[in-house]
Structure formats: C-alpha cells, structure tokens
UniProtKB/Swiss-Prot annotation:
InterPro entries: RING-box_E3_Ubiquitin_Ligase (IPR051031), Znf_RING (IPR001841), Znf_RING/FYVE/PHD (IPR013083), Znf_RING_H2 (IPR024766). Gene3D superfamilies: Zinc/RING finger domain, C3HC4 (zinc finger). GO terms for cellular component: Cul2-RING ubiquitin ligase complex; cullin-RING ubiquitin ligase complex; cytoplasm; nucleus. SUPFAM superfamilies: RING/U-box. Part of SCF complexes, which consist of a SKP1 or a SKP1-related protein, a cullin protein, and a F-box protein. Interacts with csn-1 and csn-6. This is RING-box protein 1. Zn(2+) 1 binds at C44, C47, H82. The RING-type zinc finger domain is essential for ubiquitin ligase activity. It coordinates an additional third zinc ion. Keywords: Cell cycle, Cell division, Cytoplasm, Developmental protein, Meiosis, Metal-binding, Mitosis, Nucleus, Ubl conjugation pathway, Zinc, Zinc-finger. Its main location: cytoplasm. It comes from Caenorhabditis elegans. A zinc finger (RING-type) spans 44-100. GO terms for molecular function: cullin family protein binding; ubiquitin protein ligase activity; zinc ion binding.
C-alpha cells in the first residue's frame, strides 16, 4: 500500500491494487469554535445587569476592588440573581422576585 505522499496527484492506491480517485483534498483547514454559559438566565432581574457582569452595588464600589466578590446566587426555582441583589431583596421579602415562591438557595457562586 503506498503512502499518500507517494501517490500521484488525486490518486490513492488501495490494498486491492485498484486505483481510486480522491473525492477532494483538504488544502487548508481553519477550525472555528463557539462556547456559551450553560444557563437560561442572562440578566439579573433585580438590577438588570448581565448575570456574569458586576451588579450595581459592585459597579459603584469598583474602586474598592471587590469585583471578585460579585457572585451569582441560584434559587431552588432555578432563577439566578447577583448575590448582593438577592441579599438586599431578602431583607424585606423571603420570596423569589420572579415567581413569589419561598426563596431557598440552591447554589452560590459562579
């Protein structure tokens, strides 16, 4: 069996000694990839900022360097909010701002 580099242009020799023309030859390949967060929530419903951006409280205190502390809090209802936003909300009401179910933390952090 001949190697592809030994074959003449557009021909390959198979094990049965038959000559078969290639359908096509890849000259150059540029791969493209796409990724996205696996979440259904894009924005915090309280401050309306993107959920992966800083909340309004952290934006106001950006000079203090607290941006690593701006995390996402998920409820058992699968709604997500900035932790600072939902913490302020929970001081007055113990329910989810979107569906009025009793708020319980499902997970906390990015």
């Amino acid at each position: 069996m001949a190697q592809a580099s030994d074959s003449t242009a557009m021909e390959v020799e198979e094990a049965t000694n038959q000559t078969v023309k290639k359908r096509f030859e890849v000259k150059k390949w540029s791969a493209v990839a796409l990724w996205a967060w696996d979440i259904q929530v894009d924005n915090c419903a309280i401050c309306r900022n993107h959920i992966m951006d800083l909340c309004i409280e952290c934006q106001a205190n950006q000079a203090a360097g607290l941006k690593d502390e701006c995390t996402v809090a998920w409820g058992n209802c699968n709604h997500a909010f900035h932790f600072h936003c939902i913490s302020r909300w929970l001081k007055t009401r113990q329910v989810c701002p979107l569906d009025n179910r009793e708020w319980e933390f499902q997970k906390y952090g990015h």
